[in-house]
A protein has these predicted regions:
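Conserved beta-alpha-beta core of the PfkB/ribokinase-like small-molecule kinase fold
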Residues: 2-80, 96-97
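Conserved phosphate-binding/catalytic region of the ribokinase-like
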Residues: 18-22, 70-191
Length: 191
């Protein structure tokens, strides 16, 4: 929502969404709510709900869910979240792990126990590493609803571990591990 504040950037996003859709891209949306940037919370709520149905993958946190849906229960919120083109909901809960939902499957993965020193960029790292896995495996938007519980669990586990390494370091992008670091710091990817 940072770049959706009423400005030319909001309209640039709509144009980019149209172009990406026409090119066959998977569209993901992480509302990443930043209340101080919005003079009116209702306007923020309406804007997020304007963009949410345009996406294939919605990533939101346990802190964002109540504001967007009026409930702290992700499973109670799912019927509302599966609107428009939404095919996959990713729900992050910090040190408690993450969940993934399609209309027919769901998965959970715990986060490794680590001592966090800086959580800046953790949400971006989670969605980025999740999208990387989809790209690596050649998953298309049409295939998102067919992802199995096993595959979703594998993706969540990888992204949780990616973030577990990241939050043990200072900074955002600078804290993101390489694939080699992923293998050595969690070899053989133990919990």
């Amino acid at each position: 929502s940072v770049s959706l504040v009423d400005s030319p950037m909001r309209y640039a996003h709509l144009a980019a969404i149209t172009a990406a859709r026409e090119a066959g891209a998977i569209l993901s949306f992480d509302p990443n709510l930043r209340f101080p940037l919005w003079p009116d919370r209702e306007q923020l709520h309406q804007t997020v709900w304007q963009f949410l149905p345009l996406t294939h993958i919605l990533k939101l946190s346990d802190e964002e869910l109540p504001f967007l849906t009026g409930t702290e229960d992700i499973e109670a919120a799912l019927p509302r979240l599966f609107t428009g083109d939404v095919q996959l909901v990713l729900y992050t809960c910090g040190s408690k792990g993450a969940r993934a939902y399609t209309r027919t499957a769901s998965a959970r993965a715990r986060s490794p126990k680590v001592t966090a020193v800086d959580t800046t960029g953790a949400g971006d790292g989670f969605i980025g590493s999740f999208l990387w896995q989809l790209q690596r495996d050649g998953v298309t938007a049409a295939e998102l609803p067919k992802l199995s519980r096993k595959r979703l669990t594998e993706y969540l586990t990888f992204s949780n571990r990616f973030c577990a390494i990241s939050v043990q370091r200072h900074g955002a992008i600078d804290s993101y591990p390489t694939l080699e670091q992923m293998e050595t710091e969690f070899s053989p990817f133990q919990e």
